[in-house]
Amino acid sequence: MSESQNFFIAYYPSSNRLAVFLDLSDRLARDKTLKGQVKILDAAGKEIKTVKLTMPGGKGEALLDLPDLPDGTYKVVASLENLAEKTSFQREFVRLHFPWEGNTLGLCDKVYPPFQPVKHSGKTVEVVLRRYTLNAFGLWENVISAGKEILQGPMEIKGETSQGPLKWKTGTVNLTSRPTAAQCLARAESEALVIETRSLIEVDGCMRVEMALLPGRKPQEIRWLAVSIPLKDELVSLWHVMQSGSIRHNPTGAVPSGQGVVWESSQTGNGPMLGTFLPYIWLGGPERGLAWFANNDRGWVTDDNRSVQVLTRKGRTLTLDIYLINRPVTLSATRKIVFGLQASPTKPMPKNWRLAEDIPMHGGSNGYWGIIPHFAGKYPADRDYTFADELLIARKTGRVNQKFLKEWVENKIKRIIADNPEQVEDRTRHVYSGMNSISHRGKKPQLIYFEEHAQDITSPEWEVFQDEWGLKQYTERAWSRQQPGTGAAINGCRSYQDFALWHAFQWMSRGLGMYCDNTYPRNWENVHLSDAYVREDGQVQPSACIWELREYHRRMWCLQQDCQVLTEFPLLKSVHMTNGNILPVVTWADISLDNEWAWKNGEEPFPPEVLLAE
C-alpha cells in the first residue's frame, strides 16, 4: 500500500537539501521505535540517495544533502521495516533552474544619497542625522538624533544572581568602519557570565547586535538579565508596537502615562508568537525616537507567564527593559542572541516634500501591466517583457499601440485563461486601462503593483521554491492551479530576493517604480532556514523575518538607484504598510502608504497622536 498522509517533505533548492518528516505516532506505542529508509529517485527510477530513518514513538525526521539536481521530477519514497502492515509513503518534488538564481542585483557597496558615508572617531559613529557613542556592552552610551540627545543615560546590561546584582568588568571598545558600515567589538565580564558583542551599524543607522552570553569563571544562578534603555521622557510622547503577522491594529499613538510600570508585554497579544515576546517597539516623538526589534527570542531564557518587555517611568526617565533572562538559570553553554536598534529619523525628508503635487499611480492591481495573476504575479504573461517595452513607447509618444494590445489579448490572455471568460474580460480591461493611463504620465513617476508579501502559487518558480519561500515548515504541497486572486505568503529569504529583484530590474530599467503592497513582519516557522526554533516544550517559536524583509527592501532600493541611470523617467519605491511601520524596513522606501484600516470600526477619525506615531 502507498500513501502520503502523515508523510511530508520540504525541498530547498538553494542549499540542495531535502527535509522529510513521517508521523505514525497514532499507530504505535510511545515506547516503540520504528526503523526504515528514505529513497530519492529520479523520473527513470534511478536512485539518487538512500538514508536510514529512525522513528522513536513513531515520529521521525531527517535532513538530507543532495547533489545539484538536473531539471526534472523526483520521487521521495519512505518504507518501514517493522510496521505490522507493509506500507510505503511517497511524495514528489520538481527541480527547474532559472536564470535569476544567485544574482547579485542590489548587493552593492555604495552609499547613495540621501545617506552619507559612515564615519567613526574613538567610540563614536556618525551616520546621516545621527551620532552614536558605543560602550563595552556593544550598546549605545549616547544617541544624538536630529541634534538632540534622546537617552537619559547609557544603555546597559543589568541583572541579578543568587549572590546579588551583577558587577561588570568592562574591556575596550574596538571600532572600525568603512563607508557603508561600522563594526564594534566589545566585551564585558562578571563572575557569573561573560558577554561578547559584535555590533554592525549601517548607513541608515540600523545596528545589528550579535551577543554571546557565556558562562563566567564562577557560574551562578542568574535570576534575571535585561537590556536597559533609558530615554528622556520629555522626548517620548509616542510609541508603536508590532505584533508579528499583523499589518493592522497594532498598538500605536500616545505612550502609556503614569509613574512606575506603565506597560509590559504580557498586556499585549502577540499572535502566533509564544510567550510574551513582541518583535518591535518604537518610542519617540514626531521628530526623533528609537526602535528595538528582533526576529524572536531565540537564545533567551524566559517564563511564558512573565513579561519580557517592560516600560517603566520614573521621574523624567522612561526606561524600556528587554529581559533576555526572566527566570532562574545557571549558564552551562554559550547562548547567542540577535536584536536590532535604530534611531529615527533614518534619513532626511526630500526638499519641499509637503508640497508634492503628484502622487505616483499604481492602479491597485498588477493586471494593468500585463501580469495575469492578479496581485501576486511578478512578470508579464509568458515572462514576455515586450508589454513593458510598449508601456515605455506609449509613455514617450503619448500614443497607444492598439494592434499590439489586440494581439496581446488574443495570444496571451485568451490562451492562458481560456477557461474563464470573466477573467479574460477583466484582464483585457486592465491591460487597455494600464496602457492608456501611462500614455498620459509623461515624466511623472509611475509605479507598478509588485506584491511584497505573497507569490503566485500557479507559477513554476513557486512549484520549485515553495518550501524555501513559504512560511510553514511542511505543507501538503497541493496548490490550486486556477488563477488565484492572491497567493501564498512568503518570507523574503535570499532566493526569493533574487527572484523578485531579477524581475524588478526588468521593470525599473524601463522607468517603472515599485509599489510593494502589504509590507509587515510575518511568522516564518521553518527551523531549517530561519531563526525559528524548537522550544524546550517541543513547540516551534516562529521568526518575524524582519532581518530578511529589511535585506529585501534594501536590495530593491539600491537596485532602484542603479537603474535610475538607465532611464530618463524618475523612479520611486513605495511600501504599503498600513499600521506596520517598522524603521529597519520602511527606511528603504521613498513613499509609505499608511492607515488602510478604520479607527474604532470607522466610527471615529484617527486621533492626532496615532497619525503622528505612524
Please place each PLM-identified region on the residue numbering.
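Short, compositionally biased P/S/T/A/G/V-rich stretches that sit at domain boundaries
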Residues: M1-R17, D23-S25
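Carbohydrate-recognition beta-sandwich/jelly-roll modules
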Residues: M1-S4, R30, K49, P56-G60, ...
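Beta-strand-rich binding/interaction modules
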Residues: L18-L24, L28-K52, A62, Y74-A78
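Active-site-adjacent "subsite" loops/lids of carbohydrate-active enzymes
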Residues: T397-S509, N595-E596, N601-P605
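Glycan-recognition surfaces
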Residues: D456-G487, A544-E614
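Active-site neighborhood of glycoside hydrolase catalytic domains
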Residues: S495-L583
